Each structure stands twice: as C-alpha cells, then as structure tokens.
Amino acid sequence: MLGLVLGEEQLLMARKDSEMTKRTIANVNASGVFTVNFPLHKGDDTFMSSKQFEKFYWPSLRKLILALVDEGIMASLFCEGRYNNRLEYIGDFPKGWVTWQFDQTDMANAKRILGKNCCVVGNVPSSLLAFGTVNDTKEYCRKLIETCAPGGGYVLTGGTAVTEAKPENLRVLMEASREYGVYR
C-alpha cells in the first residue's frame, strides 16, 4: 500500500530509510493489523537474474519481513509469476509467521523447501478456472492438495485474482477442498 501512496521510485528510495520503516511498523501496530500483504510483481525468475535478486531485491525485502515478524506482525506475500529459482532464498523465517502465495511456481518444490517454516498458498491457474472443465479443475485441485497438504501449512486457492472464472469451476474448487483437503 505504501507503494501506491509514494510511487515506485519513492518507495525504492524509502527502503533505505530505516526510520521510515520503523514509523510504518509503528503505524501498523497502532492500527491493530496483524498481517501485512505484499504483492511481489517484480521479483520473479523472468524479471531479474538470481544474482540480481540476491544482491538488490532480497536483502531489503527479507529485512522488512523480519522487522515485521519481530513486531508480531505476520507477512503474507503474493509471488506473481515464477519463483522456482527463488525458493532457496525465501524460506528462512520463524515458523508460522510468513505465508507465500504462488502463481506459476512448482508447488511440490515450494512445499518441500518452504513447508517446514512457511505456509504455502496457491496455485490453481486462473486460466483453468476461466476456461477449463469441471473435471479438469477438480483433478488439478486434488493433485495440488495431495502434493501440498501433508504436514499442514497449505491453503488451496487460485494462483492470481480470478475475475472471469466459470462459477461451476469455483464451486468445484471449494468442493475439492472439502473432499480432499481434510487433515486426518
């Protein structure tokens, strides 16, 4: 939200200002909010190299997430695009404080690498929900649940916002979560 207010360039400059980070966290705490959501539109595998991610993108984001966690605020991050090459970086957080929602990331690897400490969320493709059959949608959801649910820490949902989904596919997504998503 701060990015919407400040604009992208100002936000990038502000990330170096630890006082601004402290003031922002204090305002979040004062508001009673216990989760902060981050849409990560520019960190995916195709936007920058792993070396660039490691040097420029990840250190400041990790620092911000840890500052929130230190203040008792959970971080929920939406990873637009593919984060397959980022998974090894993004899971080193205290257990139960960080949620990663994925759009086009290999969910088996995401669960394997992140699932011990972080909640993994996603990634039923919006194209499947918009254009797929009911049977294909249910089968995709079943496989995702079988892959990601063991051990807990998984939420079945769309990979991105779904604005054009077929109602019957949304219904079958919910039915599949009730049928296959029961922890035993």
Name every feature range the model reports, one short phrase each.
Residues 1-184:
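Active-site loop segments of alpha/beta catalytic cores
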